[in-house]
Amino acid sequence: MSKEEILEAIKNMTVLELAELVKALEEEFGVSAAAPVAVAAAPAAGAPAAAPAEEKTEFDVILQEVGSDKIKVIKVVREVTGLGLKEAKDLVESAPKPVKEGVSKDEANQIKAKFEEVGAKVEIK
């Protein structure tokens, strides 16, 4: 199978199928898909010093702490991300973890409010 065929197959997958694929790849190769995100975000931390006039337009919502009602938090994760029950549960149990990335400030604040309503602690970066 060529690289182009693999990419074409991935393009035709649903979000749920992609989430399952990522999980299977993580298990198969013993890696975490979240690690590259954290590494990629680290250099950006120094960037504002170079361009202070540029305002950030994309934000990441990171689930820091679940709180006392894990089931309600899982429901909010499913609502916000569209993940299946198992994927949402895995995300909640592996907090701190990004829930939604590259969203507008308004959307990030709305998502944060939903999580805070059910007792979870979220950070917007």
From Swiss-Prot:
Entry keyword Cytoplasm: no
Gene Ontology molecular function, alphabetical: mRNA binding; structural constituent of ribosome
Known function: Forms part of the ribosomal stalk which helps the ribosome interact with GTP-bound translation factors. Is thus essential for accurate translation.
Alphabetical UniProt keywords: Ribonucleoprotein, Ribosomal protein
Disulfide bonds: none
HAMAP family: Ribosomal_bL12
UniProt xrefs under InterPro entries: Ribosomal_bL12 (IPR000206), Ribosomal_bL12_C (IPR013823), Ribosomal_bL12_C/ClpS-like (IPR014719), Ribosomal_bL12_oligo (IPR008932), Ribosomal_bL12_oligo_N_sf (IPR036235)
UniProt cross-references to Pfam families, sorted A to Z: Ribosomal_L12, Ribosomal_L12_N
Family: Belongs to the bacterial ribosomal protein bL12 family.
GO biological process: translation
Database matches in Gene3D superfamilies: 3.30.1390.10, Single helix bin
Name of the protein: Large ribosomal subunit protein bL12
